[in-house]
Design a protein with these regions (language model features):
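N-terminal membrane-sensor/transducer module of prokaryotic signaling receptors
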Residues: 2-152
Length: 152
């Protein structure tokens, strides 16, 4: 009995001294998860673009998870057709902190059938503190779609 009590007490001490050290990582999506979400998004756009854009914009759990989400823009004019907060703005006008013109880069470099990536500084939702973010993106028909993840 004393061994069991000692075990419980020592584990409780560990939890108090080192509370939930893995929680921040669990709150953020990973590179692998971002790329997998983009691949699901590409398949959805190819199957039914209108339905896919609706799913992206309504926050369907296959396309929005923690800080991962799908965004899409028209190839022709760069207007964002899917984004949680800035739908209707133009992709090429987006700049990260420190002047990185990542939106313009995405517009120029997106290629059908190839997933590319770009890194820039962008605040998390609800914050104005910029963090390093990498976005995977590709061209799908008349759309450019991407999913980004934060480095930390």
């Amino acid at each position: 009995m004393w061994r069991r009590l000692a075990f419980v007490v020592s584990n409780a001490a560990v939890l108090v001294l080192f509370p939930a050290t893995s929680v921040p990582a669990a709150q953020s999506g990973t590179a692998e998860e971002a790329k997998a979400m983009l691949e699901r998004a590409v398949a959805a756009v190819k199957k039914d673009k209108v339905k896919a854009l609706d799913l992206f914009n309504t926050g369907d759990s296959r396309f929005r998870d923690r800080d991962l989400y799908v965004f899409c823009a028209n190839v022709s004019d760069g207007v964002l057709t899917a984004h949680p907060t800035i739908r209707g703005k133009t992709l090429q006008d987006l700049e990260g902190k420190h002047g990185a013109e990542f939106g313009q880069e995405i517009m120029q470099e997106a290629t059908e059938g190839m997933i590319k990536e770009t890194t820039y500084w962008w605040p998390r939702a609800g914050s104005d503190q910029p963090l390093e973010k990498t976005t995977f993106y590709t061209k799908v028909g008349d759309q450019i779609c991407g999913v980004g993840y934060y480095q930390k």
